[in-house]
Amino acid sequence: MMTYEYILVRYGEMTTKGKNRSKFVSTLKDNVKFKLKKFPNIKIDATHDRMYIQLNGEDHEAVSERLKDVFGIHKFNLAMKVPSELEDIKKGALAAFLQVKGDVKTFKITVHRSYKHFPMRTMELLPEIGGHILENTEDITVDVHNPDVNVRVEIRSGYSYIMCDERMGAGGLPVGVGGKVMVLLSGGIDSPVAAYLTMKRGVSVEAVHFHSPPFTSERAKQKVIDLAQELTKYCKRVTLHLVPFTEVQKTINKEIPSSYSMTVMRRMMMRITERIAEERNALAITTGESLGQVASQTLDSMHTINEVTNYPVIRPLITMDKLEIIKIAEEIGTYEISIRPYEDCCTVFTPASPATKPKREKANRFEAKYDFTPLIDEAVANKETMVLQTVEVVAEEEKFEELF
């Protein structure tokens, strides 16, 4: 019985790139290779406009499951490779059609003749291939407008690809082509989604989390580690910086009027994150802010908070409502982790009436009464850094180390 031997990957947005296209293709190939480490028999060939993954006996469903999370892939097809002879093409088309799962009642044939010297024209091939499928199946009809299955045939010199099963990729651009950002990862619903959407634009992320023991628990810290771990499904690794924030928060609570404590806290977070960004050669800061969602996310608040950093602040969720954000969180697997009931540092010192229209002048005047620089230095110096990779990759590396 014929089985799928190849997966053909289409790039999508990457095809609009000019001189940098080879870099994008190379990065995507590297990311796919990393994602498919578990499958040693696979061979990957990336051309200018498509990627060919030769399965060599590996499970196509298991490989497909991992491919769907790789940014830079628009769509991919499970494919069979047959000699460019009419009888072989007919047999391959039938075999591919029979492997399609689900309630299939209609189909159509699409033929692309890359090899123009093939002895039959497209309009001659359609009834030959379609007729062979009809002769060898029951209760199946042709529907050229809205078929359940599109049997695609690509004819080349010497061989042809037969494809039925088309699947959607993650879209976007390959992670790594767009530089690096620091993302503020709170442990809530929004910030992991912001990290995901940033990666979708080809940007590598490192996460910064502020925790305030004993006011925040080890479980709250573990929750953030688990979120960062979940995000590794979409990239090679996530570096997580855990910043001790207790002394900064206690000082803000003591020295700053309560209405401005939230604003000043966010400004301190920006200052610390900027320092880490400089150390790590990051080019921007990403946050999970959504306009008007809470008091610290008004335009006035953002204007006042932005003052303390020269780095671009990327806010992927800025115009989304909460339901839109939750939907993405559920799709990417972070929602159930985010709703674990453990407080983060943003909630333990929440003022009763935070200013919704804070002014830069006031924030600067309040901050000038106390020298926060030593506390910022201490927080940066005492941060804990860990590098997280997908569980499977870690398991493979541990297995390799056990051999020595």
UniProtKB/Swiss-Prot annotation:
It comes from Bacillus cereus (strain ZK / E33L). It catalyses: [ThiI sulfur-carrier protein]-S-sulfanyl-L-cysteine + a uridine in tRNA + 2 reduced [2Fe-2S]-[ferredoxin] + ATP + H(+) = [ThiI sulfur-carrier protein]-L-cysteine + a 4-thiouridine in tRNA + 2 oxidized [2Fe-2S]-[ferredoxin] + AMP + diphosphate; [ThiS sulfur-carrier protein]-C-terminal Gly-Gly-AMP + S-sulfanyl-L-cysteinyl-[cysteine desulfurase] + AH2 = [ThiS sulfur-carrier protein]-C-terminal-Gly-aminoethanethioate + L-cysteinyl-[cysteine desulfurase] + A + AMP + 2 H(+). This is Probable tRNA sulfurtransferase. Its EC number is 2.8.1.4. Pfam families: ThiI, ThiI_fer, THUMP. NCBIfam families: tRNA uracil 4-sulfurtransferase ThiI (TIGR00342). Gene3D superfamilies: 3.30.2130.30, HUPs. The gene is thiI. Keywords: ATP-binding, Cytoplasm, Nucleotide-binding, RNA-binding, Thiamine biosynthesis, Transferase, tRNA-binding.
